[in-house]
Amino acid sequence: MSQKRYFFTSESVSEGHPDKVADQISDAVLDDFLRQDSTSRVACETFVTTGQVIVGGEVTTKGIVDVQTIARKVITDIGYTKGEYMFEANSCGILSALHSQSPDINRGVDRKEEIADEFDRVGAGDQGMMFGYACTETPELMPAAIQFAQQLVKKLAEIRKEGKMMTYLRPDAKSQVTLEYENDIAKRVDAIVISTQHDPEPAGISEAEWQEIIKKDVIENVIKVLIPANMIDENTKLHINPTGRFEIGGPHGDTGLTGRKIIVDTYGGAAPHGGGAFSGKDPSKVDRSAAYAARHVAKNIVAAGLAEKCTVQVSYAIGVARPVSIYINTHDTAKHGLSDNQIQEKAEAIFDLRPAAIIKHFGLDKPNGWCYQQTAAYGHFGRDIFPWEKTDKVAELKAAFKLA
């Protein structure tokens, strides 16, 4: 039998990437609203550019948020603390343009008290379809390429913040990982691309010499530390700052906007995406909460050993609590002789995908031990700190199919 061979690539960006700066500010604002009023309705968008931050959107809340203080703290924590970056926490201008949510939308989301079932009282915040995915490629049940890509830029940030080596690093960075597959199994890393912002070369060192130093440091302190040695061979291509100098970056180099890194936020292109971004949205927005729930369904199906891969789609109508449709596809990897229809039937009985039920199950209105700002860099999935990553339905799924 001939082997199926192909290459697959995913990318990530660091917390200092301009789009991620925007995401983190939006989610930090959301966190503060929810801390004051867990019923807050928030849709917060952020725009960042040279020396400027604009925060806008719609809210319904009893809370009062100091956008200036929140944004400056986020920017400081990321590491934009030097004037030479042309985007600095204490000196950048910050404009808040938050205003009240449309009563038409609010009327559809918050239903009347006389409805008997509390989970039917909260309708979906909008129409749309959301996807969840899980697979057996990594211990986190995530696709390997996106996991590696996330880990690489996260390691760069950890080194930069620790300040003991590679002290020339600046906050902006990107990564990209290409894996070679045989029969749907990742066999090796074919290519890694890392572009990291850095200080100018020291006096007496040429640009070419400086880039060689950076390349060597990234390979030794980042790539070799994170990527398993058996996944890298003499044919693996390593592209470190392939364009050369990368001094101008962050919001000064490129304008950043909330919600522009939706594939980085999810599965690196290994699964479909419904198109709705996450950051800055309270959990009544199913773009966010239902995507988290769909991941929870897919992960539990795979963790229960029912399939090696699982894609879940759920869709909603605005103001309606129950999903319009649910779809499960195990990509011909279902086990124990099960069909996708059988798995879907049991999953629909076990997982309540009404928005209010999702919010209650995960505590999305009152985050405990985590916050939304944490989701806004390095991925919303494959990280155990988040409640939707729990495999707490495995026993029920196994019992439903009478599996030991």
From Swiss-Prot:
Pathway(s) annotated for this protein in UniProt = Amino-acid biosynthesis; S-adenosyl-L-methionine biosynthesis; S-adenosyl-L-methionine from L-methionine: step 1/1
* InterPro entries in UniProt: ADOMET_SYNTHASE_CS (IPR022631), S-AdoMet_synt_C (IPR022630), S-AdoMet_synt_central (IPR022629), S-AdoMet_synt_N (IPR022628), S-AdoMet_synthetase (IPR002133), S-AdoMet_synthetase_sfam (IPR022636)
Query: In terms of domain of life, where is this protein from?
Result: Bacteria
Q: Where in the cell is it found?
A: Cytoplasm
- Name the residues that bind Mg(2+): D19
For this protein, what is the EC number? 2.5.1.6
Q: Name one GO cellular component term.
A: cytoplasm
Name this protein carries in UniProt: S-adenosylmethionine synthase
**What is the species of this protein?**
Chlorobium chlorochromatii (strain CaD3)
